[in-house]
Amino acid sequence: MYLDRENLFLILFDDINIAYVNGELFQDNVMRDGGALFLGHLLPDDSLKKISSEKGRFRAKQTKFAAGSVFGQVQSTIAAEDDILICDDLGDEWADFIGMNTKGAPPTITFYHAKHGKLTLGAGAFHISVSQAEKNLGRLALPKAAIDTKFYSWEKEPYSNSNKVTAIARVMRGGPRSDIEKHLARLRNSPEVFKRVSIVTSSLSKKA
C-alpha cells in the first residue's frame, strides 16, 4: 500500500503528548505546556467585540472603513501606533494593511491580515488566515522594485469594492510617497527593525 510504504500516515491520539509521524511513534511531554505558550500570542482587543463584518458596506464618498468592520478597527485602533499605514487589500495583495511605526523603539513593520467570522474556540478559520499570511512572509523585506510597482496601484485611485469607488485613500497615513520612501530606505535593511505579522480576527476567542 502506497501510503504505508511511504510512511504518509499521521495519527494523533487522545493524549496530545503522543503522535505517529513519518513511520515512528513519538512522545513529547512538552506539547501540553506548548498550548499555554501559543495562547500567550493571542492578544484580546475590546475594539473587536462588536464587529459585524470584515470590511463593511461602501459608499461613493466615504473616507474610511466602517467602524463596525475589522478593517475599520485596524485603521482606527489596532494600527493606531503606526505613523505609516497603507491598505493593500485586493489585487497583488501582500496583506490587508501594511503598517510601519518608524518612531518606535524598536521600529516595526507589520503585515495586518483582517478576518471576520462566527465567534469560536476552533482553529479552522484561523488556520486559513495563517496559511494566507505564511505565503507572504518573505515580502516583509519590502523589496524596492516590488514596492515601486505597488506604489503605482496605491496612488492610481482610491479603494474600490462591491462596484463602488470610495474616497478611501490606500495610503492612509505617512504620505506623500517621497516621505515613505525615505523611511523605507532606512528601515528596509536595518538590523533593529522588528518585522511581524498580525492576524486581526473577530472570530477567535480564548473564552467563547
Predicted regions and their residues:
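Long, charge-dense tracts
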Residues: M1-R57
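Catalytic-core elements of nucleic-acid end-processing and repair enzymes
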Residues: S47-D92
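Short acidic, S/G/P-rich loop/turn micro-motifs used as interaction or catalytic elements
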Residues: G117-L121, S203-A208
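Metal-dependent nuclease catalytic core centered on acidic motifs
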Residues: P143-K207
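Extended, non-catalytic scaffold segments that flank or surround catalytic motifs
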Residues: D28-D46, K50-I51, G72-A79, L119-A133, ...
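Core nucleotidyl-transferase/polymerase catalytic module
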Residues: M1-R5, L10-L12, Q73-D88, R188, ...
